């Protein structure tokens, strides 16, 4: 009998929220099995990344270039797969204003949208996160806090 050793995959994603419009940044994926779906900035943690958030900072730089100052970072959720080998940290990144991202080859478009009008089709994991009742409540409370 062969023994299989699974390596844990740790990844992070960031949902930019612009305070001035209360809209979120979505990116149109260009590659792989999720090409043609709308997602958020993010990706896998690499060996050089010391934390899941450090991985997100690197992914932000790679995928959307220079961004406005992130005023606050709020953890939204930690998704764990059923087999407990995939962990996805999702953060809300609050910025003052919307910006025009400098997209790399992983994405072919972007859209700033409110949470009642998502771009379609939405990446399955992002959709699961945004339709989760607990996460929706957290986001609504966040809107109350930022005004």
Annotated model-derived regions:
Residues 1-25:
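Conserved N-terminal beta-strand and adjoining loop/helix that marks the start
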Residues 4-5, 18, 37, 55, ...:
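Catalytic phosphate/metal-binding cores of nucleic-acid and nucleotide-processing enzymes, i.e., regions
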Residues 9-10, 20-22, 77-117, 133, ...:
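Active-site-adjacent beta-strand/loop module that shapes the phosphate/pyrophosphate-binding cleft
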Residues 22-66:
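Conserved Nudix-box catalytic region and its N-terminal flanking loop in Nudix hydrolases
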Residues 43, 115-116, 121:
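Short strand-loop junctions, especially beta-strand C-caps/beta-turns
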Residues 62, 109, 120:
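Active-site micro-motifs of SAM-dependent methyltransferase domains
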Residues 67-78:
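A short coil-to-beta-strand element that immediately follows conserved catalytic motifs
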Residues 123-143:
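Active-site or metal-binding loop neighborhoods of secreted/extracellular toxin and effector enzymes
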């Amino acid at each position: 009998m062969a023994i299989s050793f699974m390596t844990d995959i740790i990844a992070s994603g960031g949902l930019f929220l612009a305070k001035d419009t209360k809209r979120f940044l979505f990116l149109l994926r260009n590659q792989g099995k999720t090409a043609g779906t709308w997602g958020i900035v993010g990706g896998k943690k690499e060996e050089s990344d010391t934390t899941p958030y450090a991985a997100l900072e690197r992914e932000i730089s790679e995928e959307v270039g220079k961004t406005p100052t992130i005023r606050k970072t709020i953890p939204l959720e930690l998704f764990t797969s059923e087999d407990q080998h995939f962990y996805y940290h999702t953060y809300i990144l609050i910025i003052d204003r919307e910006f025009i991202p400098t997209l790399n080859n992983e994405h072919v478009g972007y859209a700033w949208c409110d949470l009642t009008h998502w771009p379609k089709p939405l990446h399955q994991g992002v959709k699961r996160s945004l339709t989760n009742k607990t996460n929706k409540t957290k986001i609504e409370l966040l809107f109350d806090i930022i005004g």
